């Protein structure tokens, strides 16, 4: 009887420890968690005229719970972003930091073959509100277009800060 109780306790501890230490199913392999996977890979980035402007390595880390970006521009700019899905509010989130002292915090929801992330509204030097709206679109040829728009409080386009076309290395 004692042996049966002991074996039962060992069995339950084994199951519990597998769940506690991540040995069970992939927690971040849901459709929501993988909706930005089209961006994962090693890329050469071009401007709209076809000129190479940099390279970007996008990889999944932390048991597929984090997408990590490593940007290297031809003119010396570098930057990293951390991207993750937040189940509590069903949003994607990005934190971007670069070697020029800039940072962005973006948030929104994924669409089919597209990710549109926005910053909170900020005040320009002249006092007008604006937001950063960055869209990544999976193209039919497997490339990805990243477009960074500056929009006003009515979501109307003020300017385009960046357009990059990602092609796999």
Q: Whereabouts are the PLM-identified features?
A:
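Bacterial Sec-dependent N-terminal signal peptides
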Residues: 1-25
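Hydrophobic small-molecule pocket/channel-lining residues, especially in calycin-type beta-barrels
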Residues: 22-169
């Amino acid at each position: 009887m004692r042996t049966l109780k002991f074996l039962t306790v060992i069995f339950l501890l084994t199951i519990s420890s597998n769940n506690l230490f991540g040995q069970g199913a992939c927690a971040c392999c849901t459709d929501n968690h993988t909706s930005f996977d089209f961006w994962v890979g090693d890329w050469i980035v071009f401007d709209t005229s076809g000129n190479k402007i940099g390279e970007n390595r996008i990889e999944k880390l932390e048991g597929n719970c984090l997408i990590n970006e490593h940007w290297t521009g031809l003119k010396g700019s570098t930057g990293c972003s951390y991207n993750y899905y937040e189940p509590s509010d069903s949003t994607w989130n990005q934190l971007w930091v670069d070697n020029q002292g800039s940072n962005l915090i973006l948030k929104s929801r994924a669409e089919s073959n597209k990710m549109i992330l926005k910053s909170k509204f900020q005040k320009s030097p002249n006092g007008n509100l604006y937001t950063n709206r960055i869209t990544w679109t999976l193209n039919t040829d497997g490339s990805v277009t990243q477009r960074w728009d500056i929009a006003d409080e009515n979501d109307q386009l003020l300017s385009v800060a960046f357009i990059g076309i990602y092609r796999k290395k």
